[in-house]
Amino acid sequence: VTIPAGWQIDIGLEIHAQLNTQSKIFSGASTLFGQSPNSQACAIDLGMPGVLPSVNAEVFKKAVQFGLSIGAMINQESRFDRKNYFYPDLPKGYQITQMDHPIVLGGEITIQTSNGTEKIIRVTRAHLEEDAGKSIHDFKPGYTGIDLNRAGTPLLEIVSEPDIKNAEEAVAYAKAIHQLLTYLEVCDGNMAEGSLRFDANISVRRQDAEALGTRSEIKNLNSFRFLEQAIHFETERQISVLDAGGTLIQDTRLFDPDRHETRSMRSKETATDYRYFPEPDLLPVMLTAEFIEEIQAQLPELPGKRAQRYQTAHELSASDAALLSQDRRLGDYFDEVLTFSSNAKSAANWVRGDLLSKLNEHELGITACPISPKHLGEMIQ
């Protein structure tokens, strides 16, 4: 979709990544997906009188892993706040999140644009918070129920600067975040199960305007395709309103993929509407330099550096290097093949060609591959 002449778009994404811990962020309840409604919500998740939250240390490790991998600053003093609002799936009447002291500050993600060039998208912050429950509509005709299994599930909310200029860049950025999170194994990235959700903040302005336009936030997009479509339709809506001499209001919207439109849910809230204040039941969490350094030392070789190594050390093409480094387990398998074969190009052809084709045919991942790296490497050699 071409942006009309004389207009420019500014997009910032908020990505909600469910951290793949076995228990919730402030309680010992299980995070296992697909269980019967309300079977995994304990008294802490429900906010019952007299209960106190306690922090799951694993969420800090995973958040620091992500922050270090994007070159961010890790906030050694991490605090939690209450975000107050009413919604049926929020039994406490507030969400525990991080407002003033997020665990991750800054950082950047490099994406490939449609014309083949690289572009840096700045990350503003990433903070820890708890998820809410969810509504189940028409479980009985005319009724809506509440399932609180998801309440208290740990989330890492990753907020970008408005550096994204079109829907294609937004999808490229979202895919890069998805790849990194799954590569680090801090999130399973399963969008069908709600493990990764996108909120898109979109505004348009005249080409010669310096100030950002009035933005709308489109909530809870759960696929790359819906993200792209929602941005296209919202951009068209905003430009048509302004072209007709109308005025835009800052609001929160939902995307209807069947009607190909975005619809207003409510006027956009500001921070004062949520009445943030420090969470009185949780002390500040102090991360030592040793803790951060230990995580840094344990970080795997990241996809970009791995692809670069494949190109320089093994003379693979950029496309082969990117494919073999996009999945951590696939890259590990290929590296092990190379310990038994000195012919990297032939090994790459076998792995990305026949091997992956057969695995896909039988719906198997690389970790379930019946052919060992040693066997394949020795055969190639």
Regions found by a protein language model. Give the residues of each.
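N-terminal, positively charged regions that mediate nucleic acid binding
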Residues: 1-78, 83-85, 143, 164, ...
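Charged, compositionally biased, marginally structured helical/coil segments
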Residues: 2-10, 48-50, 146-163, 168-381
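Short acidic, glycine-rich loop/turn motifs
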Residues: 19, 110-118, 204-208
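Short acidic, Gly/Pro-enriched loop/turn segments at secondary-structure junctions
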Residues: 21-29, 134-137, 208-211
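Short, surface-exposed linear segments at secondary-structure transitions and domain or protein termini
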Residues: 36-38, 130-135, 222-230
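Hydrophobic (often cysteine-bearing) scaffold residues that line and stabilize catalytic clefts
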Residues: 55-60, 95-101, 170-173, 227, ...
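SsDNA-processing nucleotidyl-transfer enzymes
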Residues: 65, 69-151
